[in-house]
Amino acid sequence: MIVDDIQVGNGRTGTFFSFERAGIKPDMVVLSKSISGFGMPMAILLIRPDLDIFRPAEHNGTFRGNQLSFVGATAGINYYVEHSMDKVVQRKAKMISDFLESEIIPLNKNLSYRGIGFIWGIDFNAIDSTLALKVVHKAFDNGLIMEVAGRKDGVLKIMPPLTIQDDILNEGLNVMKESIVDVLN
């Protein structure tokens, strides 16, 4: 089994690997994007030891690593461990889910949401899938960068940085709500 943890690994779901809560033991895990710690280019393929056929230095090449990315990854992983980011993400995830339940869902009975950790989506498909992109544009006008995902790009994606401060998270959620209200009206 190969797990794609490119977007949802590195603490995004509240555990370092997204599959931990399911008790899965993958053969391979693919990581990139946030593994470098601050956006430097980096990708890693983790392989179960009994499947790894390469000896040290056997699998290499001219473009085998970006040293700055390695330093960033080390610092990012150390920060994650030292600051118990799994607990931080889980606490702030509750802030997000509580906000969605109390402030967003009451705006329209056809809205729904789903997510875990620091990756959530508000589904506009039951109303009109084009509304999600309109919210993205309105949010941008209001100073918040968001994106869409899902079928017909009808899901508004919520993916704050793991290190976001509580007050900034609340500010972003309120800007998102204001943008949704503007689009729905």
Features from the language model and the residues they span:
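Conserved N-terminal phosphate-binding loop of PLP-dependent enzymes in the Aspartate aminotransferase
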Residues: 1-185
